[in-house]
């Protein structure tokens, strides 16, 4: 029954992770949209609608996966967790390079703490569990493919379907990136509030 528990923990981590990206300190959209080459980092390609849809799809997938449990689902969760760690690392490096001349001293960006502090340990625990229980190569491959399919369903497809340079759902607060106004290309944030 540990597989279901670990999958449940993954979705609790998702709530913590999204809270860091959106609110504490918030501003994940700035780094994500910068990585995607946006000239309007408050709304394109990620806006509040696409980001909320991503989380809704991920949680819906959780409602399906938790009861199923099993090794393939656990490997999919591990792949997703590693995707988060790698993604936040790459975005952090990019933002550090762009903003070091403006005083940025680390690769931290919204979501990095929970990616490293929660998702990375979860991925390691799942990998150890998978090895310990003797999961076969086929399960590993199917799990990784399932994880990639989940990323496509939760992130890529909603963004492709709903992105809009003139979105009516822009972010209204740059969060962490308020301290780096140079990062806020094309955004219409109330910076004096």
Enumerate the predicted regions with their spans:
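Core segments of transmembrane alpha-helices
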Residues: 47-64, 114-124
